[in-house]
Amino acid sequence: MRKMSIAIVLVLVSSHAIANDDLMTAARQVFKPIPSAIPAVKDNPVTVEKAELGKMLFFDPRLSASGIISCNTCHNLGTGGVDAGPTSVGHGWQKGARRAPTVYNSVFNAAQFWDGRAPDLKAQAKGPVQASAEMNATPDRVTSTLNSMEGYVGKFKQAFPNDTPPVTFDNFAKAIEAFEATLTTPAAPFDQYLNGDVSALDDQQKAGLKLFMDKGCASCHYGLNIGGQDYFPFGVVEKPDTKLLPTADKGRFAVTNSSSDEYVFRVAPLRNVALRAPYFHSGQVWTLKEAVGIMSEVQLGAKLSEKENNDIVAFLNSLSGRLPKIDYPILPTRTKETPPPSLSK
């Protein structure tokens, strides 16, 4: 009898190991771990000098017309690369139309912004600084501000030694792109799991991973960034209410002017998703549990049980990686030539 009990235990343990191996194999076919090395950026080699300059620019509010809004205002590196409100507040207390996307791991996205209107981080960096509802500056104002401070001029010369002049709006964007390329978050429990550590996820997280794949979540949220690669309508099966999907915001339609792109958005990357509530482009959902329930119904037509929802949320918590250590930079001192703040619209 004792031998039979031991045999049963061994069979169960063996079955559990096989199930774990099958799950890991299936996951590796869909997802990739974030590399520990800084990724290469097309047509913009990332150097220490360029990334350091980009960090200064990222944190400098004087590049906005008001002198009080920086990139970090809306993409706060201390709060998951996003701000705390449903949508960002910009120049003259104007409210943005959409939730600020996270800057962490954005280098791995196929395109930038919810509607994918920027093909890369360089193009993205040029957008908010000029947007009237965000930083409300102009390329001339940006370069005039930078040229007015010798500390910046010297940094641009170091970062772009072959360019004359070194301070240009294009180089401003390249430096920010280089810095943002360093904002990756490797070594999440899920990364460790994909790299072969079966114990990196607990049983509930593994159950959530299996559900995430079996229910169809991974059809959109796949790859290295677990999203950020494709475009889909918000409301494939059932259209959300107007609180979640405001009728005035037609998503990618504004970029392509194609009726097939109405209410189509870039799939949100899910890395560090537990760190950056509220959720969706409208920023109206404050818990992962509610977000998972909504997505399962409107995108997949599935009604999750309480346990299924909790298991998927547990898996999503395993996507939080190691945040880079960021020291707040000391910025160059303004001079009498530095343009004064302008609060007018």
Language model features with spans:
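Short glycine/threonine-rich turn/loop motifs
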Residues: 20-127, 191-294, 300-302, 327-345
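Mobile amphipathic helical/loop "lid" adjacent to a hydrophobic cofactor/ligand pocket
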Residues: 121, 135-136
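N-terminal signal peptide c-region/cleavage motif recognized by signal peptidases
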Residues: 14-16
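Sec-dependent signal peptide recognition
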Residues: 2-9
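C-terminal capping alpha-helices of c-type cytochrome domains
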Residues: 139-186, 274, 284-345
